[in-house]
């Protein structure tokens, strides 16, 4: 199991990417996202399960994007996002998931969202994004499909 907690490579990558975009050198790795989102990754059967806990927004999106991209690069195209601990998702987080869906679909897989809390599910309902993902009530349902 791998955990992306804002203290490892994904955080360093996000800080470097942010610094390149806005020209600021913050000199503090992960300072904008430390502790706000963690992502645990594990493989079960033919599924790569990513458990996101915390807030998925423009400050933390890279912490999910990196392990999603790594899974796809390693040929694991059936991605299951366990959203049971995800407390918030903004448009940047939604775009990370939509981007992963396009890549996974192109590779013959897909992205399945499991156990979304009502506040997170509402973002997907309002935007219509729930129609393009496999949305499941529980993680077990997502894995069984």
Question: For the regions a protein language model found, what residue spans apply to each?
Answer:
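Non-catalytic signal-transmission and effector/linker regions of two-component phosphorelay proteins
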Residues: 1-43
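Extended rod-forming repeat segments used as scaffolds/tethers
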Residues: 10-12, 64, 137
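Compositionally biased, intrinsically disordered low-complexity segments enriched
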Residues: 15-16, 28-29, 114, 119, ...
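STAS-typified acidic loop motif
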Residues: 29-66
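Conserved catalytic submotifs in the C-terminal HATPase_c
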Residues: 44-46, 84, 116, 140
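Glycine-centered tight turns that cap/initiate beta-strands
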Residues: 46, 129-132, 138
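Amphipathic alpha-helical interaction surfaces in cytosolic regulatory modules
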Residues: 55-133
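A charged, well-structured terminal subsegment
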Residues: 137-145
